[in-house]
């Protein structure tokens, strides 16, 4: 697979304007990225501009804290799909996971997967906030709930992707599930290290620089 197809070309800053999003979309077309990842209010715009290409539209749910209710996340997912999203990057409820409320976490992921109607679901586990044991649990629950990917980070917390986390996530989910590294990946070398450790998708706001 060519390098560009690993990349979710991402712009999730709250101050991003329509002009910024359109630039992101044009870059994704030019460099043939896997997807653009945008906030939910921009999904329709992305869909309209990408529907005749093979660049997917990715959006986020429960972002960035993961602390909204399951019902809210399900509704967000349904609206995103109606607006044209191909891929859903959801944030788990980190606090529920750390409280040992395993069924809550697992059921929530399952409900998002059901609401996604066979669209790709990536589960953001926010590795920087978790212990190693919690990372393993989050990955295991994501796999059991039928998600397609586990993802390291929102990029809005205290840290991003680390090679050792990617390695642990890959070992936990096995070879048939996707692993997405996101947060703090700024060079091609960093990207290649993530891929070597098991990442099958890269979330980055500097996608153009990574493939130039």
UniProtKB/Swiss-Prot annotation:
Principal subcellular localization: cytoplasm
Species this chain originates from: Clostridium botulinum (strain Okra / Type B1)
Entries under SUPFAM superfamilies matching the protein: Aldolase (SSF51569)
PANTHER family hit by this protein: DEOXYRIBOSE-PHOSPHATE ALDOLASE (PTHR10889:SF1)
Keywords, in A-Z order: Cytoplasm, Lyase, Schiff base
Top-level taxon of origin: Bacteria
GO process annotations (BP): 2-deoxyribose 1-phosphate catabolic process; carbohydrate catabolic process; deoxyribonucleotide catabolic process
InterPro entries, per database record: Aldolase_TIM, DeoC, DeoC/FbaB/LacD_aldolase, DeoC_typeI
NCBIfam families: deoC (TIGR00126)
GO cellular component: cytoplasm
Function: Catalyzes a reversible aldol reaction between acetaldehyde and D-glyceraldehyde 3-phosphate to generate 2-deoxy-D-ribose 5-phosphate.
Associated pathway: Carbohydrate degradation; 2-deoxy-D-ribose 1-phosphate degradation; D-glyceraldehyde 3-phosphate and acetaldehyde from 2-deoxy-alpha-D-ribose 1-phosphate: step 2/2
Protein's recorded name: Deoxyribose-phosphate aldolase
Enzyme Commission identifier(s): 4.1.2.4
Subcellular location: Cytoplasm
